[in-house]
């Protein structure tokens, strides 16, 4: 009993919004019941009338809608109205076949009116009218609207990344706020979803038109069989009775279908403005009196041709002339807008400001349009998250936060191409193919794979772009397999490390100093700028980063500078002193946990020769420089084969000279001095440069 009372109270507890939520399920239940349950003729009249009214409402809403997204529910409504018409066809077919022998009113007054009054009771005329309506709906309106929806969906989807990037650019420039950006992104997504849905929903209408023809044929044939075989009617009376009912049923269904198809065409062909379709049509068709005059002249000439219906043509000629005269008079009576006062020519152009100066980003990336989904968080792009992780990991490893990577699309690039820029200059580029995998050969992979051969952009190893299905096979053969976003992120990470010294500017030096001052205020207060200038500190830190030395241990760096800067102001000399102070960290960086360090060494005779050249102030002889470079390259190759770090150990005085000389040709080589190695490590020479 309590449950019954609760059910009776349910309608009073539902709010208007809750009734709106139930509208969809109620309509589905109604459609299903129409297909399953036999309905009386009066209920069919109500449902046919409701279908006609609904189609007219949909058309009027489409006409008065100013923007496509104002009627975003149209694809769903199109589906429901199609199902409603098909359900009505099923219900009316059932009652026509069951009660058609009783007379013209067997399927209700609406079907009778459409079958008798609209076509004069002549079933041949009814069949012709029905077929014409189906052809208009199927071949003209629906086909055209479907094609427009297909092309519109394609263009909307192609333009979606550009719109997203434009919104991000406006947001970054401060032209819009975060809420407005979210609203615009939502509208762009809704527009793409709408046209994509319309592309598919148009197929429902075409299928409905085909179903209407088949249902008519089935009704006529079935009616003849039922009337003749079951009810003993003659073939002529059965054909007349059942065919007229079928024609009425078909017309009462096809006319709303034609109206709905017209509404679909209006929706997909309209242009989003501040005017509805009627205002656009009237305003643009009848705005020019010259057009009316020319049209009147053409009709007047046709009206004077012998044998033509002169009265009709001349009536329309007079109407168009009157319309042109009225439009011309309205233009002449329109109040003239006050003309703005013209400023002198030299003041008419807005003066340039400093806001017009575009500064280059410290670090940027440009991508082709195929790579835009990788950097769009709304499309689950992983690259943005990877870049954030790269910056965080780099800050933890090297001791400073690299600049933000500004990403933008560049339609001049190849679709799968990307470029990495530093201060507006390209420092790296490559190709990436979303959905495919890069199989990198580390030198030990066996066999080959089908795909596009390329080179790993970060380390220059041979690689192949393969399909996802070949991923496991590539791993079995010894390839290192990574996805497209990982390729780009690894390349970016490699370049940030390679150019870390250039990315560390005075601004970053000051920010790092401010961060250190929070922990050690007394040290920084006494040191900068009293003992060492910010310029000198910046140069020392840059020198360390240029040789891959982390600057995390700022306490040691600042204390060393505080001790030696009063005696030495040369940044390169101060860098050498700081490197010795950071010796344990440098040793740990290249030889973690190894008591024995395997390094490349210099022959004693070559070392003496280099020291003499350094003390004499002269440069290296060209022949000696070439031999030194060639032997270093050979030793480095042997070092890599042993799996040892690419480290060259030299005399402390020679380290800066050899580092600058060899780093140009062998950027992977690390030059350490004997003073920078920890005392508790045992040194083993794997190769000697300059030896016999």
From Swiss-Prot:
User: Where is it located?
Assistant: Cell inner membrane
Q: Give the coiled coil ranges.
A: none
Membrane topology summary:
Multi-pass membrane protein
| Stretch forming the signal peptide | none
List UniProt keywords, sorted A-Z: Bacterial flagellum biogenesis, Bacterial flagellum protein export, Cell inner membrane, Cell membrane, Membrane, Protein transport, Transmembrane, Transmembrane helix, Transport
Q: What GO cellular component is one of the record's annotations?
A: plasma membrane
List where the protein spans the membrane.
24-44, 46-66, 71-91, 95-115, 121-141, 209-229, 247-267, 296-316
Give me any GO biological process, just one.
Answer: bacterial-type flagellum assembly
Q: Which cysteines are joined by disulfide bonds?
A: none
Chief location: membrane
* Family classification: Belongs to the FHIPEP (flagella/HR/invasion proteins export pore) family.
The record's function comment reads:
Required for formation of the rod structure of the flagellar apparatus. Together with FliI and FliH, may constitute the export apparatus of flagellin.
From the Swiss-Prot or TrEMBL record, give the protein name. Answer: Flagellar biosynthesis protein FlhA
**Gene, per the UniProt record:** flhA
């Amino acid at each position: 009993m309590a449950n019954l009372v609760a059910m009776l109270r349910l309608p009073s507890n539902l709010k208007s919004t809750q009734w709106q939520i139930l509208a969809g399920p109620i309509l589905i239940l109604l459609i299903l019941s129409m297909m399953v349950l036999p309905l009386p003729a009066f209920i069919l009249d109500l449902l046919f009338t409701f279908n006609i009214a609904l189609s007219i409402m949909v058309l009027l809403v489409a006409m008065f809608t100013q923007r496509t997204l104002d009627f975003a529910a149209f694809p769903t409504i199109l589906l429901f109205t199609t199902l409603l018409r098909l359900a009505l066809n099923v219900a009316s077919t059932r009652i026509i076949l069951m009660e058609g022998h009783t007379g013209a009113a067997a399927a209700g007054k609406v079907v009778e009116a459409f079958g008798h009054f609209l076509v004069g009771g002549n079933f041949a005329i009814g069949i012709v009218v029905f077929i014409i309506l189906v052809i208009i709906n199927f071949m003209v309106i629906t086909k055209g609207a479907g094609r427009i929806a297909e092309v519109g969906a394609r263009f909307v989807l192609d333009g979606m990344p550009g719109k997203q990037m434009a919104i991000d650019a406006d947001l970054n420039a401060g032209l819009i706020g975060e809420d407005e950006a979210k609203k615009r992104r939502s509208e762009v997504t809704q527009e793409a979803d709408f046209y994509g849905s319309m592309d598919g929903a148009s197929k429902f209408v075409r299928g409905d038109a085909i179903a209407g023809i088949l249902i008519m044929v089935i009704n006529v044939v079935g009616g003849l069989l039922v009337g003749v075989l079951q009810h003993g009617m003659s073939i002529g009376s059965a054909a007349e009775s059942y065919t007229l009912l079928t024609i009425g049923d078909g017309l009462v269904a096809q006319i709303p279908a034609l109206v709905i198809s017209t509404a679909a065409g209006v929706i997909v062909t309209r242009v989003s403005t501040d005017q509805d379709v009627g205002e656009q049509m009237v305003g643009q068709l009848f705005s020019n009196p010259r057009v009316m005059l020319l049209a009147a002249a053409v009709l007047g000439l046709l009206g004077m041709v012998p044998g033509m219906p002169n009265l009709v043509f001349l009536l329309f000629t007079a109407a168009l002339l009157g319309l042109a005269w009225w439009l011309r008079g309205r233009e002449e009576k329109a109040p003239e807008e006050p003309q703005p006062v013209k400023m002198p020519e030299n003041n008419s152009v807005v003066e340039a400001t400093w806001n017009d100066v575009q500064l280059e980003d410290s670090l940027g990336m440009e991508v082709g349009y195929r790579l835009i989904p990788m950097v769009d968080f709304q499309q689950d792009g992983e690259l943005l998250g990877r870049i954030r992780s790269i910056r965080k990991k780099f800050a933890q490893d090297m001791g400073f936060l690299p600049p933000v990577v500004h990403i933008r699309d560049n339609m001049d690039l190849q679709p799968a191409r990307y470029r990495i820029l530093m201060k507006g200059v390209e420092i790296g580029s490559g190709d990436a193919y979303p959905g495919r995998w890069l199989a990198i050969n580390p030198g030990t992979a066996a066999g080959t794979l089908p795909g596009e051969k390329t080179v790993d952009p970060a380390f220059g190893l041979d690689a192949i772009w393969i399909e996802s299905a070949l991923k496991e096979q590539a791993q079995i053969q010894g390839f290192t397999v990574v996805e497209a976003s990982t390729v780009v992120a690894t390349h970016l990470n490699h370049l940030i490390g390679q150019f870390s010294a250039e990315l560390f500017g005075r601004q970053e030096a000051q920010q790092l100093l401010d961060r250190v001052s929070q922990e050690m205020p007394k040290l920084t207060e006494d040191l900068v700028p009293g003992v060492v200038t910010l310029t000198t500190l910046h140069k020392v830190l840059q020198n360390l980063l240029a040789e891959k030395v982390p600057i995390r241990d700022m306490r040691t760096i600042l204390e060393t500078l505080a001790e030696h800067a009063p005696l030495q102001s040369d940044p390169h000399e101060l860098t050498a002193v700081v490197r010795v102070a950071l010796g344990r960290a440098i040793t740990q960086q290249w030889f973690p946990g190894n008591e024995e360090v395997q390094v490349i060494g210099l022959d004693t005779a070559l070392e003496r020769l280099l020291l003499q050249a350094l003390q004499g102030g002269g440069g290296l002889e060209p022949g000696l420089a070439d031999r030194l470079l060639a032997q270093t390259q050979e030793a480095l190759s042997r070092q890599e084969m042993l799996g040892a770090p690419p480290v060259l150990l030299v005399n402390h005085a020679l380290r800066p000279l050899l580092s600058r000389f060899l780093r140009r040709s062998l950027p992977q080589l690390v030059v350490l001095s004997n003073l920078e190695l920890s005392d508790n490590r045992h040194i083993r020479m794997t190769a000697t440069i300059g030896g016999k």
